[in-house]
Design a protein with these regions (language model features):
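Membrane-embedded alpha-helical bundles of multi-pass transporters/translocases
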Residues: 1-430
Length: 430
């Protein structure tokens, strides 16, 4: 069934929340801990990771709960409001001593991650249930990726400026408003949408997870997406450090974000057309290859040619747009095909496991970047004014470019084995 333009665009508003939440913590939380609260780099990386690791456990549970409730839409509003409030709390805690400030961040971020799980999982599950047309889902994802690009551009480009002008607490409140606009907007715009009634799954959560993970096409898609999320998470975590220590201009963080995300506004429709002609797998492979080349080229940030770094960020952004569009359109196809094959709707469990994997990748990114900094001898401070040794500067550059490029390149292997594009039905064999 064809969806109205209002529904396609309105659903995409939820990506203001997912794009913002997927960007700002990875961009600002690690440097907030190391350069404002004075937390050691390795400990800060662990602090960023723990709440996201909690989401890895919680997301399948959220999927299971939303499967049993049936309607996904009410979760968007309730969890969305909680998400906005708790995010603001993350950056409004005490400034010291470092141990007390770190505990505040962990507790507030845990609450924030919990709310996000109960928003993101039902949100991701909706496309498979409101339309049975794979092409329609791709159109939905095209709008969604465009909105994600705007959200990343807006939040990633302006949040550092708000920090500079007004401080971290004001930034937390500002981002909270963005999250509220996205979650409430998606809830209102999808009013009246009919979610296809399919038998809910029976059995324990463990049994449902076993069934979902036994679908080969899902495993392949999930592995590729998680590895890419890890690479992108590392890249995002390095932006503030690259701007401050390699480009010698903290404001360059916003410019890098504009260069990285801006092209997505133009190329998302092109990736959609490419996938329509060549297949979603081909689109995913091509965009992944572009992202690899762009990430490698980001090593130019360590040279005296910052213009090349911005150009490389733009190239990486072109690839990144496709690596968001393709898998987000492929996931509902796999879930819907599995539902047709089994007669049981496990879409919530599929999306719960999917978002858990994405969360794990994005969470590990800053943590691993923090470890790379620690190995390089990075010096933490409370004012961001510490002089970094050569090893730390090298770690900043390598962690920002080479490490993400290698990880994203590795994701090409499982993508090549995805079969739904070729067979017309998902590989659901155990």
């Amino acid at each position: 069934m064809a969806l109205s333009a209002r529904v396609r665009r309105g659903y995409a508003l939820g990506s203001i929340a997912t794009g913002t939440f997927g960007t700002v913590p990875g961009l600002l939380l690690l440097p907030y801990l190391t350069d404002t609260l004075g937390v050691a780099a390795a400990a800060a990386g662990l602090i960023v990771f723990v709440p996201k690791a909690w989401d890895v456990v919680l997301n399948p549970v959220a999927g299971r709960i939303s499967d049993r409730r049936g309607a996904r839409r009410p979760f968007l509003l309730r969890a969305g409001v909680a998400l906005a409030v708790t995010f603001a709390l993350v950056f409004s805690g005490p400034a010291g001593p470092p141990a007390v400030a770190a505990v505040w961040v962990v507790v507030a971020f845990l609450a924030c991650a919990t709310a996000y799980a109960f928003f993101q999982v039902p949100f991701n599950a909706m496309p498979a249930e409101i339309t049975a047309d794979p092409a329609e889902r791709t159109r939905m994802m095209s709008w969604r990726v465009a909105v994600i690009a705007v959200a990343i551009l807006l939040s990633g480009g302006t949040a550092p400026l708000v920090v500079t002008a007004l401080g971290h607490a004001a930034m937390g409140a500002y981002v909270g408003v963005l999250l509220l606009v996205g979650t409430v907007g998606a809830h209102v715009a999808t009013r009246g949408v009919v979610e296809e009634p399919v038998a809910a799954p029976v059995g324990t959560l463990r049994e449902q997870l076993r069934v979902v993970l036994a679908v080969p096409d899902f495993r392949r898609l999930l592995l590729a997406f998680v590895v890419q999320a890890l690479g992108v998470g590392i890249l995002l975590a390095g932006v503030a450090y690259v701007a401050r220590y390699l480009l010698a201009d903290p404001a360059a963080a916003s410019l890098l974000f504009v260069a990285f995300v801006g092209p997505a506004l133009l190329v998302s429709p092109l990736w959609e057309r490419f996938s329509a002609r060549r297949g979603k797998r081909a689109g995913y492979l091509a965009s992944t290859a572009v992202l690899v080349v762009g990430a490698l080229a980001l090593s130019a940030a360590a040279t005296d040619l910052p213009g090349l770094a911005y150009a490389a960020a733009g190239l990486a952004g072109i690839g990144y747009a496709g690596t968001q569009l393709s898998p987000l359109a492929m996931l509902p196809d796999v879930a819907a095909a599995a539902t047709r094959a089994t007669g049981v709707n496990r879409t919530g469990v599929f999306t719960g496991v999917w978002t858990a994997g994405e969360t794990l990748g994005l969470a590990l990114g800053p943590g691993l970047y923090g470890l790379v900094l620690a190995v390089g001898g990075y010096v933490a401070s409370v004012d961001g004014g510490a002089v970094q040794p050569p090893g730390a500067l090298l770690a900043i550059a390598v962690g920002f470019s080479v490490v993400p490029a290698v990880l994203v390149a590795a994701s090409l292997v499982p993508i090549t084995r995805y079969s739904l594009d070729l067979t017309g039905s998902a590989d659901v064999r155990p």
